[in-house]
Amino acid sequence: MKIYRTKTFDSAHILKLPYESKCADSIHGHTWRVEVWIEGIPNEYGMIFDFQKISNIIDTLDHKFLNEIQGLEQPTAENIVLWLIKRIKESLSDGFKLKVRVWESPNSYAEEEITVRRKFEL
């Protein structure tokens, strides 16, 4: 079974790039759109994952200067995807699938899809 959640957040950032770019060397803002898909087996409460938990994680980025958030010192769409995956997967069981897509604009997004694998030590 799969669940899906989408949510927007507004934030500012600046990118440090070795070439000239609209997003480089100038603080600017975006209304980002995040999409999250989680696939797995529902728990004893009939839920794969609580939608509110997804919203709470995304809300930590809302109305922030992203460069000041630990782990987002270079806040590209790609790095925001990885930052979100790291936080969401902490609450997922082994074998669950997670996909996160972050839209920087109506025409541009980054996404990553993973299968959660826990490493067991003997």
How would you describe each model-predicted region?
Residues 1-122:
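Charge-rich, low-complexity N-terminal segments
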